[in-house]
Design a protein with these regions (language model features):
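SF2 helicase catalytic motif II
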Residues: 166-168, 172-215
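Alpha-helical interaction elements in eukaryotic regulators
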Residues: 14, 18, 30-34, 73-76, ...
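Walker A/P-loop NTP-binding motif
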Residues: 35-55, 73-101, 123-128, 168, ...
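Conserved nucleic-acid-binding Ia/Ib motif block in the N-terminal RecA-like helicase ATPase lobe
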Residues: 27, 89-172, 180-183
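Intrinsically disordered, low-complexity accessory regions that flank the conserved helicase/ATPase core
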Residues: 1-11, 20, 24, 88-93, ...
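Conserved alphaE helix
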Residues: 60, 154-158, 162, 202, ...
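Conserved helicase ATPase motor motifs in RecA-like P-loop NTPase domains
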Residues: 33-36, 64-70, 110-113, 186-192, ...
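Conserved pre-motif I regulatory segment
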Residues: 4-65, 82
Length: 218
């Protein structure tokens, strides 16, 4: 469309570091889905130098319906990348004792299948490279649970991508800390809200973002 050809990621408020990473991955222009979602989600969380009243405003939630290949995955990943960049910059100013308390996952991405979860992780790694691997933990059923538990303890990841059963299991065990989740993504929500996922999704929904000022966005 003409709007997509005239808008860039920078125009939408995406920081230069992330624009450069997208370009290096061969992603030059935002898709229609990204043009619709990014203005709603980027900069919705206030920066660290703004006052508490502004920071505690409720976070926006959006629902998106789009076809395969529309760029939907990056439409929700790019705002997460922006949050992580902002938090990394804030952490550089913290002392060691303050950093010790920054252990919670910040973004939870729930998918109905192993295949979709792995595809999302590949997208993160395509854009962020080795750093993406360092900050992301995959939690999917059918894979080695002990290894995933060790990954959570060792990495202290910013992003968790997984299937409902394994995420809920790790949460019940107390290994996965979700009260600091500021973004919950329910990918293919029509499948995830079906009856066979209902119990696990209820737990995920209840626990994610409990400790976030102004609540999480979904």
């Amino acid at each position: 469309s003409s709007s997509s050809s005239s808008s860039s990621f920078a125009d939408l408020g995406v920081p230069k570091q992330i624009v450069d990473a997208l370009r290096a991955a061969g992603i030059e222009k935002p898709s229609v889905a990204q043009l619709a979602a990014l203005p709603e989600l980027i900069d919705s969380r206030t920066s660290e130098d703004e006052n508490d009243a502004a920071r505690s405003q409720s976070m926006p939630s959006i629902a998106m319906q789009s076809h395969t290949g529309s760029g939907k995955t990056l439409a929700y990943l790019i705002p997460i990348f922006c949050d992580i960049l902002r938090e990394e910059e804030a952490m550089e100013k913290m002392d060691r004792n303050q950093k010790r308390h920054v252990n919670d996952v910040r973004a939870m991405i729930v998918a109905p299948s192993q295949e979709l979860a792995m595809q999302i992780v590949r997208t993160i790694e395509t854009v962020l490279g080795p750093y993406g691997r360092d900050i992301t933990q995959q939690l999917i059923g059918g894979a080695n649970a002990r290894r995933q538990e060790q990954g959570l303890r060792k990495k202290r990841p910013f992003i968790v991508v997984g299937t409902p059963g394994r995420i809920a299991e790790m949460s019940r065990m107390g290994v996965l800390k979700t009260h600091g989740v500021s973004t919950l993504v329910i990918d293919e929500a029509d499948d995830l809200l079906a009856s066979n996922f209902r119990r696990d999704m209820a737990r995920i929904n209840e626990h994610c973002g409990k400790g976030v000022k102004g609540g999480r966005r979904t």
